[in-house]
């Protein structure tokens, strides 16, 4: 079973996305911010991470940079799911190591299609 780490400061979004992904057959872990995600990654080895960009504390771009420094996560796909639509943010996220980008609100079928491409 493929494991996905969801990182977002909205617990409502985390729970709804978790339900969608679990129904599709993924194991899901959640974190409400960058620091919590890094703590989980000390022991968790997900196949993919989905993160928001705008979170209190550590933002998503900083989180991606930190995750990519971890030897066990260097090659893990990272999908950004955010309300941000600025091209500069996309460029910054890709430079940090993001693999893909989805703008909220995301349709479940769109998310699942992207996941199948990133972690077949």
Question: What is each stretch, according to the model?
Answer:
Residues 15-23:
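Charged docking surfaces used in two-component/phosphorelay signaling
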Residues 25-32, 40, 102:
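Short hydrophobic/Thr-rich beta-strand motif most characteristic of the beta2 strand and flanking loop
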Residues 44-50:
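Active-site beta3 strand of CheY-like receiver
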Residues 55:
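Receiver (REC) domain active-site loop signature in two-component systems and cognate sites
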Residues 99:
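Short, glycine/charged-rich "phosphate-handling" switch motifs in NTP-dependent
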Residues 106-115:
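C-terminal output helix
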